[in-house]
Amino acid sequence: MIIWSRQDIQIGICEKENMKALLVIDIQKSYITKYETDIVQRINERIMESKKAQYDIVYIKNTKKLRSGMVTDEFADDLILASDHVFCKKQADAFSSEELISYLNSKHISEIEMIGVDGNSCIKASAKGAVKCGFIVSIVLNCIGVSNLPRFEKTKEDLEKIGVILK
């Protein structure tokens, strides 16, 4: 039995089995152009592999205003949508969404694999949030968009220190 909490506030108790989820984070039109041209293709391949392995596929959208003032929450045109499990966030950490946490616990998810953008912000914050909630977390490095590679080296070290698995 795992008691999970968010910021020292007990949210619930959940019996967890060894179920897995793939979190696809921020693969949106407004973000994806900043990264390698084949990032969506690699993400799509991982989505299909995860679907075949019976992972629960979950999409995370950032709905906060961009620095430019623009709000854009449309997925990238060529992103494969393998499920209708979509959760919105207005903070870097996807686990700031109680709805996401409740959904994952209702599905008895214990392990989370993350792919998406950006490795130094939303992926990092979401990985830390997931660990705080008691999930086993892994990040698939070839499916992570990173705009500042030197900084990402430090990010990877920080994530490994808290138990995040880098694949």
PLM regions: where:
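Active-site acidic carboxylates
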Residues: 2-91, 101-102, 106-107, 164-165
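Short beta->alpha junction loops
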Residues: 87-93, 142-145
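Short, well-ordered alpha-helical microsegments
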Residues: 96-97, 122-124
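Short acidic/polar active-site loop segments enriched in Thr and Asp
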Residues: 110
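A short glycine-rich beta-strand->turn/loop micro-motif centered on a GG-aromatic cluster
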Residues: 113-116, 135-149
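Short Gly/Thr/Asp-enriched flexible loops that form oxyanion-binding sites at enzyme active sites
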Residues: 123-133
